[in-house]
């Protein structure tokens, strides 16, 4: 399954059970070099098990698109698996499966990534496949192929958003939170009318602009030999020509000056409330502390909102909170689903009471400790895996894209360990005010 993440979180704290995390040093040794064509390459050896991961990040996401031409980055997430010059249509998956490997891809606002996990002895196959679609995808990409995948994406949009209960919420929130002209305002999957209007030449031009070695980063990790891996990378990627030089995405200032309220009716059984705020960009001051805030509020059954809404008052079926971090700005989101007979307004009132309480007095030390334990547990679980989404290969690329260096594991952990109860209180005061946010309610009724 090809997954697309509109809100990609480095740490999904709300889904973790609390528990003590290890305090061992963070050590992810790597070698880094750059090919003449601009491809950034990161090698990491982990011989714990005989597997290898090939992880490519293209520094292009939906934020690189233009109004009227949305959904292209996600469309290529599909097209990249449909064959290239030396790999026939359908062969990408079958070759990897025959070798005992698997693969996937995802798209968000800032990047598109592709992951391949194989037995270590199939590393060369994985590098060949990845390089062939970088270099030669357009050699076999026909208008008919684009039309076929365009229809697949349209159907995905219908299934995942338009015809799914509460499915339009994330699209509505983006339009309510971000100002006109901001590249986070349109959905990663694209608008239906843009997908329909896109010409074959438009699609080709997008690939030619962004899917080039100088706009990508490659991680090879696992049971590898550094010199042999470098030789394979140079063999398969070294002759791919550079693409055009790109300028960073620009965005207008984003700020909320009041409360924006909207109610949608949908074919749902229960009301659901979404509260959203604009917050600091990823890795900026406050970003880590807001992850901790989300865990204090809704990270597990002992969290404040879960205890109050689900256990004590029994007016909610579920509640979650998270800091959705991204390069040009982030959003903090609280989502709660009412129990039968209760309303979104009731949920809103209780959530505001708990936010006010955190604004008046900091959380107890044990609450912060529990939140940090959840975050560290998630961090170390990712480090236990070489490949896949969120494994070490993926995280090396993530750190490189966000901070300019892969060497950020220890620094990342340190920024969470530095969060105090006073900092949690300060973040709620500064970034989660009741008078500057978006309030979206989805209630039962005819879908509109």
Language model segments and positions:
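Boundary at the C-terminal end of the N-terminal hydrophobic targeting segment
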Residues: 19-22
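Short, small/polar residue-rich loop motifs at catalytic or cofactor-binding pockets
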Residues: 26-29
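M16 family metallopeptidases and their MPP-like homologs
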Residues: 44, 49-65, 71-75, 89-136, ...
């Amino acid at each position: 399954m090809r997954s697309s993440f509109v809100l990609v979180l480095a740490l999904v704290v709300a889904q973790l059970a609390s528990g003590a995390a290890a305090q061992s040093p963070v050590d992810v040794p790597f070698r880094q070099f750059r090919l003449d064509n601009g491809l950034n390459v990161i090698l990491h050896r982990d011989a714990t098990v005989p597997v290898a991961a090939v992880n490519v990040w293209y520094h292009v996401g939906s934020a690189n698109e233009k109004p009227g031409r949305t959904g292209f980055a996600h469309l290529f997430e599909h097209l990249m698996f449909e064959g290239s010059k030396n790999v026939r249509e359908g062969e990408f998956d079958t070759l990897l499966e025959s070798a005992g490997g698997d693969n996937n891809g995802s798209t968000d606002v800032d990047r598109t990534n592709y992951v391949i996990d194989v037995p270590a002895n199939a590393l060369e196959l994985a590098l060949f496949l990845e390089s062939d679609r970088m270099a030669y995808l357009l050699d076999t990409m026909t208008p008919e192929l684009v039309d076929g995948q365009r229809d697949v994406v349209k159907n995905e949009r219908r299934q995942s958003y338009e015809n799914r209960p509460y499915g339009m919420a994330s699209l509505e929130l983006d339009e309510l939170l971000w100002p006109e002209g901001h590249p986070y305002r349109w959905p990663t999957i694209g608008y239906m009318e843009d997908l329909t209007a896109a010409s074959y030449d438009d699609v080709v031009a997008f690939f030619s602009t962004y899917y080039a070695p100088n706009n990508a980063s490659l991680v090879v990790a696992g049971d590898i030999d550094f010199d042999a891996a470098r030789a394979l990378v140079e063999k398969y990627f070294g002759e791919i020509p550079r693409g055009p030089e790109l300028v960073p995405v620009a965005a207008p200032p984003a700020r909320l000056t009041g409360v924006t309220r909207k109610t949608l009716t949908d074919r749902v059984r229960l009301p659901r409330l979404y509260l959203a705020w604009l917050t600091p960009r990823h890795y900026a001051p406050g970003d880590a502390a807001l992850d901790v805030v989300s865990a204090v509020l809704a990270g597990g059954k002992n969290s404040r909102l879960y205890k109050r809404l689900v256990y004590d008052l029994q007016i909610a079926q579920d509640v979650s909170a998270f800091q959705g971090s991204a390069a040009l700005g982030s959003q903090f989101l609280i989502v709660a689903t009412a129990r039968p007979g209760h309303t979104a307004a009731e949920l809103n009132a209780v959530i505001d009471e708990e936010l006010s309480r955190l604004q008046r007095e900091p959380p107890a030390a044990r609450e912060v400790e529990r939140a940090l334990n959840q975050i560290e547990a998630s961090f170390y679980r990712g480090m236990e895996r070489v490949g896949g989404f969120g494994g070490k290969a993926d995280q090396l690329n993530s750190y490189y894209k966000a901070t300019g260096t892969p060497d950020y594991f220890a620094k990342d952990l340190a920024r969470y360990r530095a969060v105090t109860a006073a900092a949690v209180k300060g973040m709620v005061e500064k970034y989660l005010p009741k008078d500057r946010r978006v309030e979206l309610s989805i209630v039962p009724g005819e879908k509109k």
